[in-house]
């Protein structure tokens, strides 16, 4: 595919948001199954990537623990649930290679994921970074203001603290998760800007609240399981979640009206793109 194809696209005629498909409540479990299949087909690349992310999350958590408190650490771990798309971008490229019958190469995946789309990804990362920093600061403030410091806290005081902290976190979580659920896969898949990708993601989440709540619960469960296993479980769980996110994007978002990238892994369609799964009508 030449670069002239994308140059000829009249971007003023492109829709502001890509339509989405209506998902069944159990669709996220199908994404997980496909994610496990990708892990099996690319075990070495997946585990190396998962190890790197697990070490990063573990290191940040330890710093938060020793320099702050366990409550700050839990707040930062909550933030990782919604920053996960940034850490999984390279995994999307591995899934895309597998779909096209290519042997996945980790260096090529990282180059395709970051170097080719660095502009839009940098804007998206900056937005998430600001939200994450505000979230982290909010966790510190909530701990300082709400956590009882006089003697042993009562059950009522602890419940009040946890309820208030959870409410504050839920506000940040809802906004960030909606914006990040499908944004980065779309940026890597099609030649779109960050605003279009974010609005498309929010639209898809709002129109599929049930399925996305299930998906969010799966992500939180995976992170909790990773923490319980001293972050060792994340070595496997991060790749599965990353691959599942890519398949979830492909099942949910109809980005066919937007141009493909002129070069790179996703410049060409996957051979069986029209027959791999039955899609519901777009909404």
Language-model regions: role of each:
Residues 1-283:
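Hydrophobic alpha-helical membrane segments
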């Amino acid at each position: 595919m030449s670069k002239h194809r994308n140059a000829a696209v009249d971007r003023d005629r492109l829709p502001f948001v890509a339509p989405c498909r209506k998902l069944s409540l159990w669709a996220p479990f199908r994404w997980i199954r496909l994610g496990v299949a990708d892990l099996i087909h690319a075990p070495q690349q997946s585990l190396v990537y998962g190890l790197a992310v697990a070490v990063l999350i573990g290191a940040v958590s330890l710093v938060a623990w020793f320099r702050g408190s366990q409550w700050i650490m839990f707040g930062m771990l909550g933030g990782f649930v919604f920053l996960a798309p940034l850490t999984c971008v390279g995994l999307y490229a591995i899934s895309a290679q597998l779909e096209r019958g290519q042997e996945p190469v980790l260096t090529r995946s990282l180059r395709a994921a970051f170097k080719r789309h660095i502009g839009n990804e940098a804007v998206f990362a900056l937005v998430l970074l600001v939200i994450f920093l505000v979230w982290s600061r909010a966790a510190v403030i909530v701990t300082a203001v709400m956590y009882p410091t006089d003697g042993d806290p009562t059950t009522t005081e602890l419940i009040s603290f946890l309820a208030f902290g959870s409410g504050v976190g839920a506000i940040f979580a809802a906004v960030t998760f909606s914006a990040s659920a499908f944004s980065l896969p779309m940026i890597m898949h099609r030649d779109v800007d960050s605003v279009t990708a974010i609005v498309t993601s929010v639209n898809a989440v709002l129109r599929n609240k049930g399925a996305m709540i299930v998906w969010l619960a799966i992500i939180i469960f995976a992170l909790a399981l990773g923490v319980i296993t001293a972050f060792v479980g994340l070595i496997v769980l991060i790749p599965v979640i990353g691959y599942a996110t890519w398949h979830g994007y492909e099942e949910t978002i109809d980005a066919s009206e937007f141009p493909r990238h002129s070069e790179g892994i996703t410049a060409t369609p996957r051979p069986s793109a029209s027959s791999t799964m039955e899609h519901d009508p777009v909404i």
